[in-house]
């Protein structure tokens, strides 16, 4: 049997002891990432009040939905009056209250299937917590992460309603500031944050855009 590398052992130990992992297990969430979306929900403030990323009744599309932690939270936030569609290349277990589609979200056939579920054309909220399969080479991992974020931006430009909201994972890299600049041109309010529930050594940040200009 192959021995685990020290880095793998350290990750497993930290994962097991992670308070967010333990809380997710207690509360029935599929991943600790659920708490990141909870933090992003009210991260934008205006005149001392929180602007909700996912308003009650919103039609939400989540890109890269597996394993479903964000999907579970989105269903709760949108409520029975809203709708949630999760899309991923990987099959995942059903999430009560959500529709799950398997495929490439930029594929024409997938977009046609999505439109059939929405009935209203464009959507109110787009979410993306997508991350690449890490190869361990920093520059390559950064480029892969940027490619996923760019695909999410493309989906937003083609499918988000005017006035809609967007949350996307970004990684520190050569294209980070250009993406933030792009978002500021697309949205009325833009905020970049690192949630408390994000691991401190992770290079990930989240961009929240409110009020899509269309």
UniProtKB/Swiss-Prot annotation:
InterPro entries attached to this UniProt entry: RNA_methyltr_RlmE, RNA_MeTrfase_FtsJ_dom, rRNA-MeTfrase_E, SAM-dependent_MTases_sf
GO cellular component: cytoplasm
HAMAP family: RNA_methyltr_E
Reaction(s) this enzyme catalyzes, per UniProt: uridine(2552) in 23S rRNA + S-adenosyl-L-methionine = 2'-O-methyluridine(2552) in 23S rRNA + S-adenosyl-L-homocysteine + H(+)
Entry keyword Transmembrane helix: no
Cellular compartments annotated: Cytoplasm
Species the sequence originates in: Magnetococcus marinus (strain ATCC BAA-1437 / JCM 17883 / MC-1)
PANTHER family in the record: RIBOSOMAL RNA METHYLTRANSFERASE, RRNA METHYLTRANSFERASE 2, MITOCHONDRIAL
Top-level division of the source organism's lineage: Bacteria
Pfam families with a match to the protein in the record: FtsJ (PF01728)
Family stated for the protein in its record: Belongs to the class I-like SAM-binding methyltransferase superfamily. RNA methyltransferase RlmE family.
SUPFAM superfamilies per record: S-adenosyl-L-methionine-dependent methyltransferases
Active site per database record: 169
Protein name: Ribosomal RNA large subunit methyltransferase E
Residues the record lists as binding S-adenosyl-L-methionine: 68, 70, 88, 104, 129
Record-listed E.C. numbers: 2.1.1.166
Gene: rlmE
Keyword field: Cytoplasm, Methyltransferase, rRNA processing, S-adenosyl-L-methionine, Transferase
Coiled coil spans: none
GO molecular function list: rRNA (uridine-2'-O-)-methyltransferase activity
Role this protein plays: Specifically methylates the uridine in position 2552 of 23S rRNA at the 2'-O position of the ribose in the fully assembled 50S ribosomal subunit.
